[in-house]
């Protein structure tokens, strides 16, 4: 793999906080992450609120989210029958708060598959309570999979106008897209490297040439994948790909696609699960916030240098516009640690070329980001690098 500074790319880690005695707001886990113990504690606290008032929408919202994000029991084993438990919460909500935004939204969120979403109820909820931006993610997801491009654009514009997506996430996704060549394929992993990218493309007409494929959406919706590729004048047979697991599916897709379209470049977002990245380890080359797939050896450091110095938008990394209390600040700072890998690989490359001054410049930029996130292990590793 074309990557010298061997720090693992990060997605999002949990923040461990001491459990409070009073219930706190439970944010979407893609926006703010807490420890498993924190979610268990909040679920118990919000349940107490519901025992006093079963018509409390805020309590239902936070209770459901907390229960949804509890992944492990006290003994450390994965929670069993989790979906059954969540289904039970939705059933209780239908009894106590049936004609409410909270019930309609969480019913959609609880769907086990996008095809099970009651789109009529979802749209009705949005029309009646348009101030709630979080429902827009489900509306974009449903219409993206169903292929209703006009509605995707409409809701993407609404989401952009709402400013619900943290500015740092938009900047990160913009740089992810800017790391790719025109007309390429980009595989993404989750909400934070997919929704902001789609919003930039659909609402801001930014790098629309890139075909963004969320691996989980594509694996579970083969018709959607086929239509998405056809929109960009590409055609393969996704139904022939593995239905066993995502890793096999992705490996077969890359082989099939690169055989049929050798002139199209495939990229893997740095935020992809390590399991998927490891599949192609010998054929992936770091060129920015993405890995470029290539069957032949390439000098990726020339591309990396060009991207960093000419193509990427990096000013925001040294200017933190939000204070510590902004909910998404820890998430954005943690995600921005991926730039450390970029800077340190570039620094080592420049040092080998004899450009010590420029190498130290990028080393210092990496150190600045590590200090922002207070990652002591990474700070030490950067300081140990001698240029």
Regions found by a protein language model. Name each.
Residues 1-24:
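Bacterial Sec-dependent N-terminal signal peptides
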Residues 20-182, 200-387:
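ER/secretory pathway lumenal C-terminal domains and tails of membrane proteins involved
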Residues 171, 191-192:
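Short beta->alpha linker loops
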Residues 187-191, 215:
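Short His-Asn-centered micro-motif
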Residues 195-199:
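Phosphate- and divalent-cation-binding pockets in alpha/beta enzyme and binding domains
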